[in-house]
Amino acid sequence: MCSLATNLLLPSKMKPVFPEKLSTSSLCVTTRRSKMKNRSIVPVARLFGPAIFEASKLKVLFLGVDEKKHPAKLPRTYTLTHSDITAKLTLAISQSINNSQLQGWANKLFRDEVVGEWKKVKGKMSLHVHCHISGGHFFLNLIAKLRYYIFCKELPVVLEAFAHGDEYLLNNHPELQESPVWVYFHSNIPEYNKVECWGPLWEAMSQHQHDGRTHKKSETLPELPCPDECKCCFPTVSTIPWSHRHYQHTAADENVADGLLEIPNPGKSKG
């Protein structure tokens, strides 16, 4: 997705190693031309490849989930990763996060995966998307601001990938297009450790409304599920093992990058 650690300073006269049509989503900042040398230095930062979603670049895997059916009692979970070698996206659709898809030194270093899950809270469906901004190692901390910007810029493409890969679900349940999208940015830096509501799914997929600067941010947090087991909510234990401590920042959140913090049942935690 975004090999931020391997971003190159490419002279403007050199041809990039990837096709022009795949570099449209790059964040390019050209410095002033040097008076001594007639060429620019262009730092290139890539995240999800093309800014415009290309279905041909998406590989969809259904793991323990029927492609044409949505389980009534369990949430639907998406795990999206990108290969810098093939420039293709891999989307796993299952009932829990696909941890095997996140193995390998590159994935652990760059942390460019995006995971999401459908939740039902008090009878209402919503899509919860998680992005890792910083924490875990110092390099991600240094570029937290850039990672936050790029994730915001490219998330509409991610949502399109979710919708395309799980098209049977959305075709059978068109009302999900109106479901709100909650985006969780996980960071050990309070400024970027936040939750944003991007509005209904159909609106969140509109790229021109989300450029990392203009999208509307929520001033409230998602509604919590019922504290006790009920029929109007999905299970309160999230299928995504990342910290959800956006409600109250604690010292333990400094390790949020590890993605291994257990998410407690909010109802049982009171007891």
Swiss-Prot record:
GO cellular component, as recorded: chloroplast thylakoid membrane; plastid thylakoid membrane
A Pfam family assignment: Staygreen
InterPro entries, per database record: Staygreen (IPR024438)
Keyword check for Membrane: yes
Induction conditions: Induced during natural and dark-induced leaf senescence.
GO biological process: chlorophyll catabolic process; negative regulation of chlorophyll catabolic process
Catalytic activities: chlorophyll a + 2 H(+) = pheophytin a + Mg(2+)
Keyword Thylakoid: yes
EC number: 4.99.1.10
Subcellular location: Plastid, Chloroplast thylakoid membrane
Phenotypic effect of disruption: No effect on seed degreening; probably due to redundancy with SGR1. Sgr1 and sgr2 double mutant has an embryo stay-green phenotype.
Single GO molecular function: lyase activity
Keyword line: Chlorophyll catabolism, Chloroplast, Lyase, Membrane, Plastid, Thylakoid, Transit peptide
Transit peptide limits: 1-54
PANTHER family (UniProt xref): MAGNESIUM DECHELATASE SGR2, CHLOROPLASTIC-RELATED, PROTEIN STAY-GREEN 1, CHLOROPLASTIC-RELATED
Job description of the protein: Magnesium chelatase involved in chlorophyll a degradation in the chlorophyll-protein complexes of photosystem I (PSI) and photosystem II (PSII). Contributes to the degradation of PSI and PSII in the thylakoid membranes. Required to trigger chlorophyll degradation during natural and dark-induced leaf senescence. Mediates chlorophyll degradation during embryo degreening. Recombinant SGR2 possesses high dechelating activity against chlorophyll a, very low activity against chlorophyllide a, and no activity against chlorophyll b.
Subunit structure: Interacts with the light harvesting complex II (LHCII). Interacts with the chlorophyll catabolic enzyme (CCE) RCCR.
The family this protein is said to belong to: Belongs to the staygreen family.
Protein name: Magnesium dechelatase SGR2, chloroplastic
Organism per entry: Arabidopsis thaliana
